[in-house]
Amino acid sequence: MAKKVQAYVKLQVAAGMANPSPPVGPALGQQGVNIMEFCKAFNAKTESLEKGLPTPVVITVYSDRSFTFVTKTPPAAVLLKKAAGIKSGSGKPNKDKVGKVSRAQVREIAETKAADMTGADIEAMTRSIEGTARSMGLVVED
């Protein structure tokens, strides 16, 4: 018989840097999960990613307090900021442009995010990432 699902916990944790402090500790502690066990497993799974990159994770907690988790790709905004070499997006994206990204970089980000996005094809996903870039105050160049 399958285990009964108690809760789904969605978090954004820095790759390779999960520790029992907030937000991880309180979110998992409420569900009765062994926090250190999660931290060790998460850090081992995200070893290949750049350390400190915010990584969304969905943790499925079962009624016997065991858990499984699935890591997603980092948010498009984070990948765009990294590609453009900026700290943050623009507060007024229509007026103040803070950086530039090439279409090739946008396409590369779309291909990275393809596993998590529900776009019809790579072109649609690329357009979606371009929209995110524009809303952050980035200029998309050919």
Swiss-Prot record:
<keyword id="KW-0699">rRNA-binding</keyword>
<dbReference type="InterPro" id="IPR020783">
    <property type="entry name" value="Ribosomal_uL11_C"/>
</dbReference>
<dbReference type="GO" id="GO:0003735">
    <property type="term" value="F:structural constituent of ribosome"/>
</dbReference>
<keyword id="KW-0694">RNA-binding</keyword>
<keyword id="KW-0488">Methylation</keyword>
<dbReference type="InterPro" id="IPR020784">
    <property type="entry name" value="Ribosomal_uL11_N"/>
</dbReference>
<dbReference type="Pfam" id="PF00298">
    <property type="entry name" value="Ribosomal_L11"/>
</dbReference>
<keyword id="KW-0689">Ribosomal protein</keyword>
<dbReference type="InterPro" id="IPR036769">
    <property type="entry name" value="Ribosomal_uL11_C_sf"/>
</dbReference>
<protein>
    <recommendedName>
        <fullName>Large ribosomal subunit protein uL11</fullName>
    </recommendedName>
</protein>
<dbReference type="GO" id="GO:0070180">
    <property type="term" value="F:large ribosomal subunit rRNA binding"/>
</dbReference>
<comment type="similarity">
    <text>Belongs to the universal ribosomal protein uL11 family.</text>
</comment>
<dbReference type="GO" id="GO:0006412">
    <property type="term" value="P:translation"/>
</dbReference>
<keyword id="KW-0687">Ribonucleoprotein</keyword>
<dbReference type="InterPro" id="IPR000911">
    <property type="entry name" value="Ribosomal_uL11"/>
</dbReference>
<dbReference type="GO" id="GO:0022625">
    <property type="term" value="C:cytosolic large ribosomal subunit"/>
</dbReference>
<dbReference type="Pfam" id="PF03946">
    <property type="entry name" value="Ribosomal_L11_N"/>
</dbReference>
<dbReference type="InterPro" id="IPR036796">
    <property type="entry name" value="Ribosomal_uL11_N_sf"/>
</dbReference>
<dbReference type="InterPro" id="IPR006519">
    <property type="entry name" value="Ribosomal_uL11_bac-typ"/>
</dbReference>
<comment type="function">
    <text>Forms part of the ribosomal stalk which helps the ribosome interact with GTP-bound translation factors.</text>
</comment>
<comment type="subunit">
    <text>Part of the ribosomal stalk of the 50S ribosomal subunit. Interacts with L10 and the large rRNA to form the base of the stalk. L10 forms an elongated spine to which L12 dimers bind in a sequential fashion forming a multimeric L10(L12)X complex.</text>
</comment>
<dbReference type="InterPro" id="IPR020785">
    <property type="entry name" value="Ribosomal_uL11_CS"/>
</dbReference>
